């Protein structure tokens, strides 16, 4: 019996070794696939800001926003310390958002970890600079989606690899500012979802010929309204349209009425990148 079983076992091992493994598909591709009458999404710029006591790029702020908007997206900025630790920070210097001073990339993590964050009103909070890893861990636990803005001093490949190592690809949309960067990241991982600037017909054509499938893209259509025909073309390809209302358009809505957010959805906007996530949620829910 043993003589018979051993060859069978060896055959089984060989068959298993020759069977191609099934590659896991990134579920974000389906999540960001445009569907007519789909739910409008809200992305909190810099993880949420503009609220007293809640600093930008702060994990506690994201938790606060998520309580009111369970499916909120969080745009975060990823920087690196002098000793190569990834953490959340928008500015190249520390003065505006922390109790520290000097250049971010000239401080080691031990120094940075001692600082406290300041809110938009220059009030010092009890909150501290979050590690990128801790934010990824939180996003996985809470099923949150991050849109990752990589600072110029940081290599995009390094950030992608860090996301992969932490098994957080399904929580991360990587923001790109050039088609070359988008192509580089897609080549490194064909499952990655990318935010790509498509603000006009020329950029649409560039994206269409870039060799990146539409399913890997979310279209950032800029910080001003585009011609609705652009939104329609993107929707035909199954691509969701993100409008950056942060800055001027948020100010316009605050002055003229938050009903403007509802009007922008009618033009074809699927995602708002905003400094006013709670107000946008209230406006589009009416």
Model-derived features: positions:
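Bacterial N-terminal signal peptides
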Residues: 7-16
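Phosphate-group recognition and catalysis centered on beta-loop-alpha active-site segments
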Residues: 18-286
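Positively charged n-region of N-terminal signal peptides that target proteins for export
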Residues: 1-4
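General helical structural elements
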Residues: 6-7, 50
């Amino acid at each position: 019996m043993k003589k018979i079983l051993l060859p069978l076992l060896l055959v089984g091992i060989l068959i298993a070794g020759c069977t191609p493994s099934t590659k896991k598909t990134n579920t974000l591709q389906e999540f960001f696939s445009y569907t007519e009458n789909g739910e409008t999404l809200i992305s909190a710029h810099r993880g949420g800001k503009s609220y007293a006591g809640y600093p930008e790029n702060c994990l506690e702020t994201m938790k606060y926003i998520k309580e009111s908007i369970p499916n909120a997206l969080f745009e975060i900025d990823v920087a690196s310390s002098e000793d190569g630790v990834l953490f959340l920070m928008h500015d190249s210097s520390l003065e505006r958002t922390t109790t520290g001073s000097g250049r971010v990339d000239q401080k080691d993590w031990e120094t940075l970890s001692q600082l406290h964050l300041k809110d938009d009103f220059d009030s010092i909070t009890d909150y501290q600079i979050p590690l990128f890893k801790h934010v990824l861990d939180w996003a996985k636990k809470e099923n949150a989606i991050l849109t990752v803005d990589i600072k110029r001093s940081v290599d995009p490949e390094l950030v992608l690899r860090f996301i992969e190592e932490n098994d957080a690809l399904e929580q991360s949309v990587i923001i790109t500012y050039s088609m070359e960067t988008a192509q580089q990241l897609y080549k490194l991982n064909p499952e990655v979802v990318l935010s790509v600037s498509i603000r006009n017909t020329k950029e649409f054509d560039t994206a269409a010929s870039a060799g990146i499938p539409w399913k890997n893209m979310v279209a950032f259509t800029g910080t001003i309204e585009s011609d609705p025909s652009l939104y329609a073309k993107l929707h035909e390809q199954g691509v969701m349209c993100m409008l950056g209302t942060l800055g001027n358009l948020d100010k316009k809505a605050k002055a003229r009425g938050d009903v403007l957010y509802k009007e922008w959805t009618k033009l074809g906007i699927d995602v708002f990148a905003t400094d006013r996530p709670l107000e946008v949620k209230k406006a589009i829910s009416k």
